[in-house]
Amino acid sequence: YPFAPEFYDLCDSLGFYVSNEIFDEWNRGQEWGYSESSYGKMPYTYHLYFDQWGETDLRRMIRRDRNHPCVALYVLGNEIPNQRIQGIEIAQKLKAITREEDPTRPVTAACDFFVGANIYGFMDQFDIAGYNYIDRIHPDSLYAAEHARYPNRILLGTETYHKTRNHVSIRDNASAIGEFVWVGYDYLGEIVWPDYRGWDEGMLDIAGFPKPEYYLRKSYWSDEPVVHIGVRQGPDRDFDWSPRNVADHWNWQGRDQDTLEVYAYSNCDEVELRIGRRSLGRKPVGRDDYYALWNVPFKAGTISATGYRQGKKVAEHRLLTAGKPYAVKVSRIFRYDDVIRVELCVVDKEGIRIPDSEAEITPGNIPSERLLGFDNGNQYDPQGLKYASAERGRCSGGRMVVYLKPDSAA
């Protein structure tokens, strides 16, 4: 990072704010991190070159990106080891360079050692105080605790867990301006190969399919009425970055004797749950939870959630039990200048996706020179991502993506 120029063009057109970040090391190297190495990040990293290249790289980034309206602020370091007194002089220098190149935007640093950074005065060097995982220190009061101590600060969650309490604390504290959740989109890396191929705790999987967590976040942020069903499929992972372990399908054969936790993620006033035609009643949506919860027995058929605002039906989500695999369906196609994204799913006779299908699919009538690759979004499947040399791809959750060159590019 920083990202490619095309990323900023896209954010400009879509209306996204960008926290333009540079450096995860200054002149001290990291001593930890996720990698194949037992001692963390590899030793030959940017701290060896910061004194020579830091100013040059910062100026080049700002000059390249400062005319993009999407750029909201600059982040001069993420979890750098210099969050102590020895980092203050460097912070002042980097901030002065940033002001010289762009006096219009605020600067921050993403601090995971913010207790020490407060004590040493490191966080006072920036326009905005950036906190990574504030609930590690303030699990109950979060941003309210920091505001009480530093009432004149602007606070920002520069990196946060998925936990709803982070959003609620920002929502209810005017001094906290927002959060950057780790992470929105699954990605390759930060793993121990070959157990899995990348980080899988995002709101969307690496193939771009939304997970139930996506709709919980949409409930936080959207004015549009939202309701989405998620069924607990097992215990939550003992991992702080993991969202709730739910799935949005209604194929639980073999668990007919179990009581299932059914979440209806929503920003409506209340939600009504139905199994088949039988109503299980309406429940209020918790203001600080953004869901209503039922414990219900599994019965094959249909489960539906209806959201109400001021007594009026405004949103609905249904899940149907799928039967036997019958066909492969093209669910969506996205066409871009240099790539076509085709979403495929395995469906039954009624067109319902088969959520446990791992079928292998060979695209028919497509010249091999147009095929770019396949992805099923499953980070634990070593065959989940295949490139152009592969003739077929494997589904996960009954779906996959095929990437093609347009006719003119073949």
Predicted region positions:
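Acidic/polar low-complexity surface segments
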Residues: I97, P106, D375-E391
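Short, hydrophobic beta-strand segments
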Residues: L293-F298, L385-S408
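Short aromatic-acidic-glycine turn motif
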Residues: K283, Y326-A327, P363-P382
